[in-house]
């Protein structure tokens, strides 16, 4: 397990982009990921048995996508996370780490690390997120983790990362998820972007459809951004990371300030009560970043970024198409009642014009 100094560095690690995450506790910078051997978590099997990235693609392309079984987090409590519980496991879970061959590291977030794993019995390849129980206790994450799991288990959509199962042992909680072979949209954007209208419109349509599905279930994502969109085969993208997602009963409003600075909506900054329209605004920011290469309101300081967001200070390069400008301008509207609906996004001329070329 990482010591406190290492953990502190990970939480505050800065990437090239000045974009920071707002969660009431400080900043969390974008972190670069690099594949490497799993540290701190071992399945007891030779990692050489995991397919190479090329073979991994073939396995994922052909494998049947079906759940491996679910073990409830209801057994998890602050008491069960205490140091005394680390002596011997007494949990009755359907899955354990021994059921998997652990391969390359896919990424590392503020809390937890994600690995490519292969289910020994079925050969099923997934992404496994391992979160230290000590960190869950230290940062009071149990309630948020349970909410994230409950929300993700209740969703079934082709553009939302599937949570197959979850289990825990003496030291860690594990989330077994769908593996998207081509990684973050953010990395693709920085390496290959900005994107042309055909590709950008394809991505925006899929995310709009995922958000439309979530909103019908009264779920707000609250952290839509390129880092939380994963790319699979054939440019199919999937919305991921539901750590800030919340169930929002009809007619109710939220007040919590959370998300990423460049993607915050005016109503969240003010601050005042907000609803699922914060996701619609974020979709507009995402559309802009995909076709321009940078967020529309990005500045060197949080204060300047906030000012531009509140003024909706939107500027387009001359290279951006008329239809793309129109869609983005109709999403990035200060008045929440005047923003284009997600249905309107999916039937917008920019989408319909490019759809035949997807």
UniProtKB/Swiss-Prot annotation:
The active site is at 223 (proton acceptor). Residues 100-358 form the Protein kinase domain. Its EC number is 2.7.11.1. Keywords: ATP-binding, Cell cycle, Centromere, Chromosome, Chromosome partition, Cytoplasm, Cytoskeleton, Kinase, Kinetochore, Nucleotide-binding, Nucleus, Serine/threonine-protein kinase, Transferase. It catalyses: L-seryl-[protein] + ATP = O-phospho-L-seryl-[protein] + ADP + H(+); L-threonyl-[protein] + ATP = O-phospho-L-threonyl-[protein] + ADP + H(+). Residues 20-35 have a biased composition (Polar residues). One of its GO terms (biological process) is homologous chromosome segregation. The keyword Transferase applies. It is found in: Nucleus; Cytoplasm, Cytoskeleton, Spindle; Chromosome, Centromere, Kinetochore. Component of the chromosomal passenger complex (CPC), a complex that acts as a key regulator of chromosome segregation and cytokinesis. Has a role in error-correction of aberrent kinetochore-microtubule attachments to ensure that sister kinetochores become bioriented and connect to opposite poles by promoting spindle assembly checkpoint signaling. This is Aurora kinase. It comes from Candida glabrata (strain ATCC 2001 / BCRC 20586 / JCM 3761 / NBRC 0622 / NRRL Y-65 / CBS 138). The lineage of its organism: Eukaryota, Fungi, Dikarya, Ascomycota, Saccharomycotina.
């Amino acid at each position: 397990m990482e010591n406190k100094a290492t953990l502190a560095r990970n939480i505050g690690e800065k990437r090239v982009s000045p974009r920071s995450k707002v969660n009431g506790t400080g900043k969390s910078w974008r972190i670069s990921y690099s594949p490497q051997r799993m540290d701190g978590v071992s399945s007891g099997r030779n990692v050489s048995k995991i397919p190479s990235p090329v073979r991994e693609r073939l396995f994922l392309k052909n494998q049947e996508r079906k759940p491996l079984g679910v073990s409830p987090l209801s057994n998890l409590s602050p008491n069960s996370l205490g140091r005394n519980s680390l002596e011997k496991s007494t949990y009755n879970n359907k899955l354990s780490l021994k059921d998997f061959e652990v391969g390359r590291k896919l990424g590392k977030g503020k809390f937890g690390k994600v690995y490519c794993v292969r289910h020994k019995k079925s050969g099923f390849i997934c992404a496994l997120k391992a979160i230290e129980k000590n960190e869950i206790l230290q940062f009071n994450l149990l309630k948020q983790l349970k909410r994230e799991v409950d929300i993700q288990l209740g969703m079934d959509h082709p553009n939302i990362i599937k949570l197959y199962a979850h289990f825990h042992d003496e030291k860690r909680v594990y989330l077994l998820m769908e593996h998207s072979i081509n990684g973050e949209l953010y990395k693709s954007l920085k390496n290959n972007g900005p994107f042309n209208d055909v590709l950008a419109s394809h991505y925006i349509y899929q995310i709009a459809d995922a958000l439309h599905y979530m909103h019908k279930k009264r779920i707000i994502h609250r952290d839509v951004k390129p880092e939380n969109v994963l790319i699979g085969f054939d440019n199919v993208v999937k919305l991921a990371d539901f750590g800030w997602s919340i169930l929002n009963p009809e007619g109710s409003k939220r007040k919590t300030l959370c998300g990423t600075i460049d993607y915050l909506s005016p109503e969240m900054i003010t601050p005042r009560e907000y609803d699922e329209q914060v996701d619609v605004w974020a979709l507009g920011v995402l559309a802009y970043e995909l076709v321009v290469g940078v967020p529309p309101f990005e500045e060197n300081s949080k204060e300047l970024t906030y000012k531009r967001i509140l003024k909706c200070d939107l500027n387009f390069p001359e290279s951006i198409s008329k239809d793309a400008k129109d869609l983005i301008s109709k999403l990035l509207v200060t008045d929440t009642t005047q923003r284009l609906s997600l249905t309107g996004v999916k039937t917008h001329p920019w989408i319909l014009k490019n759809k035949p070329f997807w």
